[in-house]
Structures are given as C-alpha cells and as structure tokens.
C-alpha cells in the first residue's frame, strides 16, 4: 500500500485501484490546497499501471464522502486573481481525474457537497448508498460563490440545464433516490455493498452513455435555452432583489459554457469565482458560516453537562408539538408529553405524524423509520412517566402564576436533578423561578415558530441558574438540530427585543398613510425574507403584539406602538394568517390563492393608504431602530458577543445574511455613519432614534464590534 496522507491507494488483486479518502485528525473530509500534490502523485501511479481495470474513489470516514472544500483557502486569498488561480488549480485537478484511461467511479456514502461533488462529477460514474446521511449538492451560492472546480460545466451536461440551474442557484441537496432520478448517480445500493458494487462497475469495459430526458434535450437547444435562461433570470432577480451577485454570475457562466463550449465555460467559471470571492456579500456570508460553526461548538458554559437521556414536555399545542418532534425525531431522545386533556396529546402526536408522513411520501425515510421515531413520543394527562426525565420543557400559556405552578409540580414529580426549561417569549426567567426549591435548575429555552423550521433557540439563564444547567440545555438544543445562543434574562431577551421596534415603526408608518405592500416591499428589497407587516401576520397579530407592553414597561417610550391601531385591528378579529384575515386576506385552507392586502385595513386605522416615502426611507426607519437596539443589547451584555448577536438576528428573524448580521453591518457602515444617520432620523421623527451610548462611544473612539483579530475565517 502507498500512503499519501489524506489519500491512500490500494490496488486489489482484481486490478481495481481503490483510493480511500481520510483527512487525518478530522471528523469530516474537506479538500485543501495542499492535497493537490497528494492526488497528483496517486493519479501518476494509476496512469503508469497499465494492468489496472478501473479506479474507485471512496471515503474512509464513517458518515461522509467529502463535505466540500476548506473555505479558509478563500480567506487566505488577497485578491481576485489569487482566488481565480485557486479555482483554476481545482479545475485542472478534476480534469486529470476525468482524463484517466480507465473507468473511474465515485463510491459515495454520506455528505458529498461542494468540491466533493465536483470531484465526483469528474469521475466517469457515481454510485451512492441509500442511507439518510447521503446527500449530494453544490451549496457554494450560500457563501456568495459558485462552484469553482468545474461544477457549473459538468453538472448541466450530466443532469440537464434546468435541473443543474435549480441545484446550483439554490444550493439544494438531493437525497440518494432523488439523485438517481435526476441522473446524478448511476445506482443506489446498501452501504454494506457500496465498495463491491463500485468495483464491479469499474470493471465494465464500456460504460453506457446516459441520455438526457426529452425536456432537457429541448432546453439544451438554442431556442429552448434562450427561453429558459430568460425565465430563470427574471425569477432569480425577483427572489434575490439584486442582493446576491453570485446568482447572476452562475446563470452567466452556465450559459457561456453551453453556448460557447466547455473551454469558455471553465474560463468564465474561474474568473467569476475569483471576483465573487472578493465581494462584500461573499465575505459576509462566509463570516456567518464560520460564526454558526463556532456557535455549534460552544458548550455554553465551562461546566460539564448533566445527564440527558429523556425529556418531558408540558403542553401539546403548536409549540409543544414542534418541540416534541425536534427532540424525538432529530435528537433521538424519548419524549413524554403532559397536557390537561387527551386532545392536546393527540395534537402533539399528530404534529409529528404529519411531518414524518410527509418525509415518507417524499421517500426521504421509510415507513419503518417513521414508526421507530414516532414510538419515542408518548403522553399522559398526569405526571406518570416523568419521574426519571432529565429535562422538562414547559410550553404552556404566557401566564406567570401558571408557569410557577409548573415549576412546583415538576419539582414534586420529577427527579432531584431534573432541569425545568421554560419556552416563554416574554416573562422573566427569574420570576418563573422565584418560588422554586431548586432555582439553579430553572432556565429559559425560547424556541421560534414553526419549531421544526426555525434554526435558532435562545438559552436564558437567570441570576441563580447553574453552569451545569446551562451546559445541559445547550447540549439538548444542539441534539435538536438547533443553533443556540445564550442570552441574559432581560425583558424581550435578544431577538424579540430588536424585532419589536422594527415592527412598531412599520405600524407607525401605516398610521402616517404608507401602504402595507409598499412597506413590506421596501424591507424585502433591503434583504429580509418577508416584510414586517407580513411577518406580523405570519406570527399572529395577537401573539406578535403581546410583548409590546412588557418591553414598554421595561424600557420606556421607545417601545410604544400606536396602541389604538393595534387595538382596532385585534377588535376586528384580525389575527393574521391563522384566521385568514389580518393586514392581508388569505384564501381558504387547502386552496392555493395569492394573499392580497385587505383594502379595509386603511379605513379601520383611519388613513388613505397613499405612499409618500421612498423604499430606502422606509427601510432606514425600520432597520436603524433594530440596529440601535442591537447595540444597546451588546452594551448591556444581553448577548455575549457580536458573533451571537449576528447569528441571533440572521437565524432568528431573517436579518439579511449577505450583510453578515447587524453587528457586521454596523461595522461596515461605521459607527460615525450610524450615529449621524440616527441623529438625522431623530430630528425628523423623534427621540426614539437617539443613538445609544454604545454607538456614540464607539464613534468617538473609532471602534468596531468585531475586533481586527476576528476575520471571516474560522479563528
């Protein structure tokens, strides 16, 4: 056997070369620049061995093929030319793999993403396992980049241009059966026979060429291609609002390769990669990637976590059902639900059943796996089955005496070490723990709705919460697939506190006569996934406005909302999407219909509904209040770092990722510009815009939230 660090070459007795990929000291295989020489040495041996019948590339890791290229390589590039050179080196290496004179097979188990899939595309055939861990995709667009090692050219020719555009523009990942249907892989097999199946495929002298479906062949022609690219450009522009330059470059590069040939396509790909790597959007998106990776590694405290073998949940409603699903089906932990009636328990069980059944229907999991996961969830109307639970999450109504009662009942019916975690969105954790016998085991664990989709949770210790309780709760959040940030026990915590003034200002502009759709469109153009008015409809107007009095009582007038407007809307039985009428009107459930602004809303709040402000003015009024409040949270140590503040805003409320989060955005603007803009807005609209002391100090000292040592790399 010849060993070259991350790549090991073994020639079998049947003259098939097996190249095992195993990056030393890492759980996950990633491609690094220094591996190029190692791979070339192996390729040289393969070319020189005339007896070889074929080659198989396979991972020696337990659950991943290659998860992508090491993103730090891009951060080390000083300019676009260096990044372009990096891409050309990758292209050349993949070309050498493709040019091998014998069949080359990629045997894929686990994640095959980014540079990993580009390497698999350079192989002559691909075969993968039917395991749930096996996913294939090109997610570079999520980092503001495009695939730089030939992916934009090989994928369209393999699966067709429309499928390739969809995969590369969205970064979506295909499961094994989806990849087979798309033509991305040639076979799907059990993991136990992956190597042997790949070897047998490698020994075939002539590999049949795959024919693209008729639709893809039509779209590959000049007329079909022109129509497709025109439609894709229009749809992409609507979706990105021009905020993500990578999407436009992806379309250009793929079109160039199809219209002018592969050579021109590879050249365009490398140049685009180099230029995109230097854009502020890519730098911000990479910063978010590194920050989220760091947060996922952060234990929350220095203490070791306590036992975490089973979980209890109080309340089987919308939040309780969602929490049960992520705990059992993502975390693999047994869950016991308690509700005051069987309907609540049945609701929670049906919640998980519906989500799992959707996965079965889409062939993401088998029915047996659905049943296995559902068996982890049980329920009762009393505390039977709770005595051994390590952590209990309450998801009951926002009522302080009720939550205090829950604490007392858990302490009476559960083990001495059981942690009580409250899913409150507004009540102080210290107040919930006020009468507790073991206050050190009481903590906040704030999920966002819908629980199965929203990636963030806030972990909220109060003054007496122990370090071990924090560590155990953070560990649970990670098992649930969440990104946890630890925040202080102050009114609104972090996410709701910075969101409230943003939504309040949108409502205030409505009272001034601005139109609903104009306000929402302005913030979507700025980069939010939905506008503030639509967000309020989605959350529920009753739910979303409930926290405003709490924040106003804690922080004063800057959190006041036009109370008469909110009252008028709620008194008219407008709750948003959940009851079909809010600021927007919604069609009947189960019937597809486009939401429309209800014109009656203007009469209800006593205005004409005629927009006078520009989109930029609307965005400034909402966003600047959010940024100012985020700076206050930093100053008051509500968040532990700018990193946590950026992650909380991006993952919790959809703050534009291409801006890197509120703190990176404020650093990009500069504290002096922030203070000047806030002062200008304060002169126009009142003292709620007065810049906070933190920003004024930073402007005087020319400081930034992110220190110079905190770059967009993982350090």
Curated annotation (Swiss-Prot):
The residues annotated as site (Important for catalytic activity) are 118, 140
Segment 3-hydroxyacyl-CoA dehydrogenase: which positions?
A: 306-715
Pathway assignment: Lipid metabolism; fatty acid beta-oxidation
What reactions does this protein catalyze? a (3S)-3-hydroxyacyl-CoA = a (2E)-enoyl-CoA + H2O; a 4-saturated-(3S)-3-hydroxyacyl-CoA = a (3E)-enoyl-CoA + H2O; a (3S)-3-hydroxyacyl-CoA + NAD(+) = a 3-oxoacyl-CoA + NADH + H(+); (3S)-3-hydroxybutanoyl-CoA = (3R)-3-hydroxybutanoyl-CoA
UniProt KW keywords: Cytoplasm, Fatty acid metabolism, Isomerase, Lipid degradation, Lipid metabolism, Lyase, Multifunctional enzyme, NAD, Oxidoreductase
**Renumbered residue ranges of the record's region Enoyl-CoA hydratase:** 1-190
Q: What sections of the sequence does the record tag as coiled-coil?
A: none
**Where's it found, cell-wise?**
Cytoplasm
User: Its domain of life?
Assistant: Bacteria
**Classification via Pfam families:** 3HCDH, 3HCDH_N, ECH_1
- Give a Gene Ontology cellular component term annotated to this protein: cytoplasm
Q: Where does it primarily localize?
A: cytoplasm
Record EC number? 4.2.1.17, 5.1.2.3, 1.1.1.35
The biological process GO terms on file are: fatty acid beta-oxidation
GO molecular function terms noted in the UniProt entry: 3-hydroxybutyryl-CoA epimerase activity; enoyl-CoA hydratase activity; long-chain-3-hydroxyacyl-CoA dehydrogenase activity; NAD+ binding
Q: What does this protein do?
A: Catalyzes the formation of a hydroxyacyl-CoA by addition of water on enoyl-CoA. Also exhibits 3-hydroxyacyl-CoA epimerase and 3-hydroxyacyl-CoA dehydrogenase activities.
- Family per UniProt? In the N-terminal section; belongs to the enoyl-CoA hydratase/isomerase family.
Q: How does it assemble?
A: Heterotetramer of two alpha chains (FadJ) and two beta chains (FadI).
Q: What is this protein called?
A: Fatty acid oxidation complex subunit alpha
Q: Which organism is it from?
A: Salmonella schwarzengrund (strain CVM19633)
């Amino acid at each position: 056997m010849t060993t070259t660090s991350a790549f090991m070459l073994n020639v079998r007795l049947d003259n098939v070369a097996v190249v095992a990929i195993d990056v030393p000291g890492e759980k996950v295989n990633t491609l690094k620049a220094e591996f190029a020489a190692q791979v070339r040495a192996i390729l040289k041996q393969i070319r020189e061995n005339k007896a070889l019948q074929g080659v198989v590339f396979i991972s020696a890791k337990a659950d991943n093929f290659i998860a992508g290229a090491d993103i730090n390589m891009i951060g080390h590039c000083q300019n676009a030319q260096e990044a372009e050179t990096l891409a050309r080196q990758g292209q050349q290496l993949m070309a050498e793999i493709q040019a091998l004179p014998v069949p080359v097979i990629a045997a894929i188990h686990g994640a095959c993403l980014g540079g990993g899939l580009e390497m698999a595309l350079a192989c002559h055939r691909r075969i993968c396992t039917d395991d749930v861990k096996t996913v294939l995709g090109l997610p570079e667009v999520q980092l503001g980049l495009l695939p730089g090692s030939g992916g934009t050219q090989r994928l369209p020719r393999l699966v067709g241009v429309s499928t390739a555009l969809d995969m590369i523009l969205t970064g979506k990942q295909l499961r094994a059966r989806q990849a087979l249907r798309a033509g991305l892989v040639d076979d799907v097999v059990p993991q136990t026979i992956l190597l042997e199946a790949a070897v047998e495929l490698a020994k075939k002298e002539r590999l049949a060429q795959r024919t693209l479906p008729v639709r893809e062949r039509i779209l590959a022609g000049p007329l079909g291609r022109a129509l497709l690219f025109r439609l894709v450009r229009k749809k992409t522009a609507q979706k990105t609002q021009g905020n993500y330059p990578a999407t436009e470059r992806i379309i250009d590069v793929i079109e160039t390769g199809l219209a002018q040939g592969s050579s021109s396509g590879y050249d365009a790909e490398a140049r685009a990669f180099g230029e995109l790597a230097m854009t502020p959007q890519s730098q911000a998106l990479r910063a978010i990637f590194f920050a989220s990776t760091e947060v996922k590694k952060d234990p929350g405290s220095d203490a070791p976590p306590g036992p975490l073998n089973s979980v209890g949940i109080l309340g089987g409603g919308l939040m309780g059902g969602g929490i049960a699903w992520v705990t059992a089906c993502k975390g693999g932990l047994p869950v016991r639900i308690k509700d005051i009636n069987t309907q609540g328990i049945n609701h929670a069980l049906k919640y998980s059943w519906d989500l799992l059944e959707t996965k079965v229907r889409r062939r993401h999991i088998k029915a047996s796996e659905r049943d296995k996961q559902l068996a982890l969830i049980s329920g009762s109307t009393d505390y039977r089955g709770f005595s051994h639970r390590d952590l209990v999450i309450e998801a009951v109504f926002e009522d302080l005496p009720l939550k205090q009662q829950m604490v007392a009942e858990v302490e009476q019916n559960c083990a001495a070490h059981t942690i009580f975690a409250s899913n409150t969105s507004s009540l102080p954790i210290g107040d919930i723990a006020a009468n507790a016998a073991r206050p050190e085991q009481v903590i906040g664990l704030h999920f966002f709705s819908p629980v199965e989709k929203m990636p963030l949770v806030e972990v909220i210790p109060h003054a007496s919460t122990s370090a071990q309780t924090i560590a155990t709760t953070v560990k649970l959040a990670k098992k649930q697939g969440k990104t946890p940030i630890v925040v202080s026990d102050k009114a609104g915590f972090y996410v709701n506190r910075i969101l409230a003034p943003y939504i309040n200002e949108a409502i205030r502009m409505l009272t001034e006569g601005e139109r609903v759709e104009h306000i929402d469109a302005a913030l979507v153009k700025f980069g939010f996934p939905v506008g503030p008015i639509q967000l309020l409809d989605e959350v529920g107007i009753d739910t979303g406005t409930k926290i405003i009095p709490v924040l106003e009582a804690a922080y004063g007038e800057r959190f006041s909302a036009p109370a008469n407007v909110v009252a008028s809307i709620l008194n008219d039985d407008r709750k948003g999407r959940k009851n079909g009428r809010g600021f927007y009107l919604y069609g009947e459930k189960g019937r597809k219909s486009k939401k429309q602004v209800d014109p009656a809303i203007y009469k209800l709040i006593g205005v004409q509904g005629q927009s006078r402000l520009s989109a930029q003015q609307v965005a400034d009024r909402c966003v600047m209040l959010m940024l100012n409040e985020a700076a206050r949270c930093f100053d008051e140590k509500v968040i532990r770092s700018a990193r946590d503040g950026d992650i909380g805003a991006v993952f919790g409320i959809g703050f534009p990722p291409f801006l890197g989060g509120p703190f990176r955005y404020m650093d990009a603007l500069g504290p002096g510009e922030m203070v000047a803009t806030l002062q200008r807005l304060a002169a126009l609209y009142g003292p709620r815009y007065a810049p906070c002391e933190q920003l004024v100090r930073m402007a005087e000292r020319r400081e930034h939230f992110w220190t110079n040592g905190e770059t967009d790399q993982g350090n």
